[in-house]
Amino acid sequence: RLAQKWSLKNKINLINSLSNHKGALLDIGAGTGNFCETSKQNSWDVYGVEPNEKAREIAAKKNIFLHQSIEDFKGQQFDVVTLWHVLEHLPDLENTIKAIQKLLKPNGVLIVAVPNYNSFDAKHYKRFWAAYDVPRHLWHFSQKSMSKLFSENMKLLKTKPMIFDSFYVSL
């Protein structure tokens, strides 16, 4: 619980350091709404997407009302879009990234956390590394692959390890 609070605080600090003002934030893969709740408490106008109905119900008990799909936000744009350990689960990366780009305001910030298959943990545990998580993790990323994936229409501002973000080392 302490690690989760610390991680949420670090995520808010990261967003605040990359965005020049607190505005509309969309969290894709919002789970039970913990990050949305923390963002709301820190003066962000929060929206979220979570396909899992039970997770949305838990979030609703925290007064965080999540949508089922990013399709619900067609025509809207956000100052910040986050994907915390979501990208590796999505089957159609190219079209998903295009859809996310349309959701960003000009000069908006996209923050993506993914497991790093070049991390110390991955090298140490090799084929037993927890984040390989097949079949749920469809993709595996490194800093280089993430840079290449987003280089076409976006400017990479920063890559950094996210300590305690998950039980494995993340980008």
Predicted regions and their residues:
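Generic structural "secondary-structure junction" signal
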Residues: 122, 134-136, 169
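Conserved catalytic loop of SAM-dependent methyltransferase domains
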Residues: 154-171
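Short glycine/proline- and charge-enriched loop/turn segments
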Residues: 1, 125-134
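Conserved SAM-binding loop and adjacent beta-strand
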Residues: 1-11
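Conserved SAM-binding loop
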Residues: 10-128, 138-153
